[in-house]
Regions:
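Conserved phosphate/anionic-ligand binding catalytic regions in large, soluble enzymes, centered on
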Residues: 56-73, 301-305
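Flexible, glycine/charged-enriched surface loops at secondary-structure junctions
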Residues: 108-109, 125-133, 217-220, 270-280, ...
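Extended Lys/Arg-rich, glycine-bearing segments that form polyanion-binding/interaction patches
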Residues: 20, 87-91, 95, 99-212, ...
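Short acidic-glycine loop/turn motifs at beta-strand connectors
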Residues: 35-42, 68, 75-80, 87, ...
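Conserved catalytic-core subdomain
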Residues: 1-17, 26, 169, 227-353
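Active-site-adjacent loop/helix segments that line or gate small-molecule/cofactor pockets in enzymes
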Residues: 25-33, 47, 60, 172-220, ...
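Short, Gly/Pro- and small/polar-rich lid/capping loops
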Residues: 1-49
């Protein structure tokens, strides 16, 4: 169990307008930091006023992308209490990421304790407005000043928090996606991790998508370039002739917490779910045959993002007449209902602060 010291700020910030929060724009009064080195392991856990970090310019994180991160939220329920959604899954995923990136990891229970501690300390920053939440960003960075390519001897685990607005400020609406020539991940790589390099390398395709009038990129596998894997920075699902398909998490696909939750809910509802590899050709054929019923992405930020149009090699699939699908909508309402405490948590997923 962590021994966390706490220092409250003497200059608290003014709270932002909950009707105009945006995403990742505002930050709470405090942050959590835990140091790590080879001799002491994790030590000096502390909550301090939010402030810039002081790092050596040669810190290895700047030169070799030696870092990892997570993303989860705290939700204000109708009775005013605060809860988290499956934080243990984020903790385990960070352990898996850190193993791949040669970074040290907090045990699951310490990760969850740290998250609960900073949220409780800054609980006044958890917004009350409909659809808002407190986004929580834990991350690990290599801090040793060294330009040789090897593992770092010193690290920091840090959590910052940001009150965020409703992702769909005008309602949940389908987006348009397209497939591009770029590759997100290959077998043996870091596709299953949450490391910054994965996201930086995806931006060029995102820019191209926007230039062509599309919101997101559909990522295919990096070997044969024929199997669907992710959409943008989300997991993706395809409902074809009554069955819901999503890519297997076998090394190139991020094991999303929302993805996992959707699969469990769908199975509870008795809807067939396949985690077999799905060729993009089969998706387009299903569209032409009138069997492509719904497409949606899943992730912490948006929860569920419906897709209304998919472009592949000049061919365009129009999904459900550009309207949100029945299962997509039901999943969104169910997940957000559990997260914000408006529906009973029969799955045991929420953790009270």
């Amino acid at each position: 169990m962590l021994q966390i010291t706490k220092q409250r700020t003497t200059t608290p910030k003014a709270k932002p307008d909950e009707g105009n929060l945006g995403f990742g724009v505002h930050y709470t009064d405090h942050m959590l930091i835990i140091d790590h080195d080879e001799e002491k392991g994790w030590h000096d856990a502390r909550i301090v006023p939010y402030q810039p970090l002081e790092l050596d310019p040669a810190a290895m994180v700047f030169h070799y992308a030696m870092e990892s991160f997570e993303g989860l939220k705290a939700y204000r329920t109708p009775d005013g209490s605060i809860q988290l959604f499956r934080p243990d899954k984020n903790a385990q995923r960070m352990i898996n990421t850190n193993h791949r990136m040669c970074l040290p990891s907090l045990p699951v229970e310490d990760f969850v304790q740290a998250v609960k501690a900073i949220v409780e300390f800054d609980q006044d920053w958890v917004p009350h407005a409909e659809g808002t939440s407190l986004y929580i960003r834990p991350f690990v960075i290599a801090t040793e000043p060294h330009l040789g390519v090897r593992t770092s001897r010193t690290h920091k685990f840090i959590i910052v928090c940001s009150p965020v607005g409703a992702y769909y400020s005008t309602g949940i609406n389908p987006v348009k996606i397209f497939e591009d020539e770029y590759t997100r991940a290959c077998p043996g790589g870091t596709g299953f991790t949450k490391c910054g390099g994965n996201y930086a390398a995806s931006l060029i395709s995102q820019v191209k998508a926007h230039e062509l009038g599309y919101e997101q990129t559909l990522w295919l596998d990096g070997v044969e370039h024929k199997y669907v894997e992710e959409v943008g920075s989300m997991n993706c699902f395809f409902k074809i002739d009554g069955t819901v398909y999503t890519a297997p998490t076998v090394g190139t696909v991020l094991p999303g917490v929302t993805r996992m939750s959707c699969i469990e809910i769908l199975k509870k509802w008795g809807i067939p779910v396949s985690e077999e590899r799905l060729p993009i050709a089969d998706v387009m054929k299903a569209s032409h045959d009138g069997k492509l019923e719904e497409v949606f992405g899943t992730g912490t930020a948006a929860v569920i993002s419906p897709v209304g149009e998919l472009r592949y090699e000049g061919d365009v699939a129009h999904i459900n007449n550009g309207e949100i699908g029945e299962i997509t909508h039901k999943l969104y309402n169910t997940l957000t209902g559990i997260q914000w405490g408006k529906l009973p948590d029969d799955m045991g997923w929420t953790v009270k602060i």
